[in-house]
Amino acid sequence: MIPLQHGLILAAILFVLGLTGLLIRRNLLFMLISLEIMINAAALAFVVAGSYWQQPDGQVMYILAITLAAAEASIGLALLLQMYRRRQTLNIDTVSEMRG
């Protein structure tokens, strides 16, 4: 069994990597991937904590997080596809400019 601290440190590293990608990247597809990494890091923390205290609650929360991530990914990719068809780019700086 992995010690609690090692699992939580790994989850924190993954979360920080996802947050860094979310803040630095200007491409919406990479931002969506970074958000998925952050969701998986939080789910990993739930599983590690549940395993440490020998409770199945962490695994239940993991299933909920994966369901949330799947719904977020499907809606996000559908929106990205429509935006790319209209603007021919996924750069957030060009998409956020106002027309008028």
From Swiss-Prot:
Oligomeric form and interacting partners: NDH-1 is composed of 13 different subunits. Subunits NuoA, H, J, K, L, M, N constitute the membrane sector of the complex.
E.C. number(s) listed in UniProt: 7.1.1.-
UniProt key word Ion transport: no
Protein name: NADH-quinone oxidoreductase subunit K
Single annotated GO MF: NADH:ubiquinone reductase (non-electrogenic) activity
General function of this protein: NDH-1 shuttles electrons from NADH, via FMN and iron-sulfur (Fe-S) centers, to quinones in the respiratory chain. The immediate electron acceptor for the enzyme in this species is believed to be ubiquinone. Couples the redox reaction to proton translocation (for every two electrons transferred, four hydrogen ions are translocated across the cytoplasmic membrane), and thus conserves the redox energy in a proton gradient.
Alphabetical list of InterPro entries matching this protein: NADH_UbQ_OxRdtase_chain4L/K, NUOK/Mnh_C1-like
Bilayer-spanning residue ranges: 4-24, 28-48, 60-80
Pfam families named among the record's database cross-references: Oxidored_q2
Family classification: Belongs to the complex I subunit 4L family.
Organism: Pectobacterium atrosepticum (strain SCRI 1043 / ATCC BAA-672)
